[in-house]
From Swiss-Prot:
Residue numbers binding NAD(+): 347, 368-369
Site (Transition state stabilizer): 102
Name of the protein described by the UniProt record: Bifunctional polymyxin resistance protein ArnA
Binding annotation for UDP-alpha-D-glucuronate: 393, 398, 432-433, 460, 492, 526-535, 613
Positions annotated to bind (6R)-10-formyltetrahydrofolate: 114, 136-140
Organism: Salmonella gallinarum (strain 287/91 / NCTC 13346)
Lineage, top ranks: Bacteria, Pseudomonadati, Pseudomonadota, Gammaproteobacteria, Enterobacterales
Amino acid sequence: MKAVIFAYHDMGCQGVQAVLDAGYEIAAIFTHADNPAENTFFGSVSRLAAELGIPVYAPDNVNHPIWVDRIAELAPDIIFSFYYRNLLSEEILHLAPAGAFNLHGSLLPAYRGRAPLNWVLVNGESETGVTLHRMVKRADAGEIVASQRVAIAQDDVALTLHHKLCQAARQLLNSILPTMKCGDIPSVPQRESDATYYGRRRPEDGLIDWHKPVSTVHNLVRAVAAPWPGAFSYNGSQKFTIWSSRICPDAQGALPGSVISVSPLRVACADGALEIITGQAGDGITVQGSQLAQTLGLVAGARLNRPPATSGKRRIRVLILGVNGFIGNHLTERLLNEENYEVYGMDIGSNAISRFLLHPRFHFVEGDISIHSEWIEYHVKKCDVVLPLVAIATPIEYTRNPLRVFELDFEENLRIIRYCVKYRKRVVFPSTSEVYGMCTDASFDEDKSNLIVGPVNKPRWIYSVSKQLLDRVIWAYGEKEGLRFTLFRPFNWMGPRLDSLNAARIGSSRAITQLILSLVEGTPIKLIDGGQQKRCFTDIRDGIEALFRIIVNDGDRCDGKIINIGNPDNEASIQELATLLLDSFDKHPLRCHFPPFAGFQVVESRSYYGKGYQDVAHRKPSIDNARRCLGWEPSIAMRDTVEETLDFFLRSVDVAERAS
């Protein structure tokens, strides 16, 4: 039986080995690239796959139609997911005749969702387990195939329980996989009335509330002990982490948070005292409790507290859906540079935002807007400004997957707009320069230019009309129901983290990334229809500054406005862009590590994009609205943008890859 496996972490390694031991053929393994901001104490699925000689992939979005097609070509009989962190689309789940099955780290239907290992310890459970279940659209809700119970000892912490669960998972898989291979797959529906759901835990969730019962505080210490981020508190402004503790029943009448003694170090809780066995001050080393007290300058009677508040004024909460994308990650950086903004974000990956994951004002959840509607509705209600940035926005996908473009770019975003109407929240919506289509004006005016697209049999326009229709719906909600909105139209923004060379390899990237990939790989630069199409290229820093000013909305001047954000002075044809890029490439200090230039190749657009494609000769913005509403003017020259973008991509190429 041929299997395709989605796996990560120690549990992923156990699953892969168990599937092999049961005699399955593994056609491919899909995993994740390690996050540099995460403590990767666990085994590497990619390394295991490489050692076993099994093809392994780590796409940013495995649910992308390109990857769905590739998985379909593998023709799996069965699909397994072992601690893979992303939900799989229904298209993938339906590819295997025998079904798709996930290993979950709890006794379902209890503890559905994220981090069940930590949550069972937080809640003081005495038993947990692992469950193999059939995968359906809703996470962790499918029929149960098999489960294995695991007792939780009073001295178990996150790491010891993790090891127990891995061992139980291996026993479970060794028992059930041979049976499944013979076609005998048990199926027991979950009792929805017994289901509980828990969300992702963040490092800041380790903050101790000394007014809680001592058992609650002790369980928190157990749940997030190393290698997890740890339970922590403050002595004044100094943070310290507690790595191990024990319960003492007598608080001697002390107030919660009071230091009862320093040797041993004991702190009063609501109904007892916590003895701190080991801990760590700031970024220092782990020491015993009495030494920690000495380091912190604690004395009996001192009161521990929460971190000091920075300001009495509530910060502005900004919800960014698609926060890991090009605009989303740069906008997050700009907002976090201002003290009065708090960012909440969702996306299907976190590679571009890994540098923010530990930031105290950045709150990220990995998820899909087409699945996590309850989370989105809750955060629309909670936040002040909403930016729905999720969209398929690469031309080749318009002809490859027009229905998927419509479903995501229009239908899913319309639901978010309706939440904004329902809760009366301000929305800053990304329209697109593509809505102008084949407009013949010398420069495109937001309030006067006609929006002209081609015939219905040219699916290339599905993105343009999806965005245009949403623009019109948003405008109508503003007129009829008082929705506060601003529409912004980016004109060919460029810069670091635009997309990836891997995306370019499958044709799903912006023009400059495709050009850079050709230089990196020593293949001819393809000029579609000769590359005579003109665009106005805008530096991401200029674009983000304009977008930031829209969010600030000084004097409410952006309400109900459509604003082009582009640089009319940076107009160039694609051929001119390629020539400028080649010149910068030849001068780059890493040039010697890459193959010789392979020349230019003129390609017909039909052969490259498909028969449903049409192009436009020029696309230049009028930026009068931006000047008037934002006091904004772009300032960065195109050459500077090209050089910085090129440098980012060249330095992202692995040294071994350069040499090959």
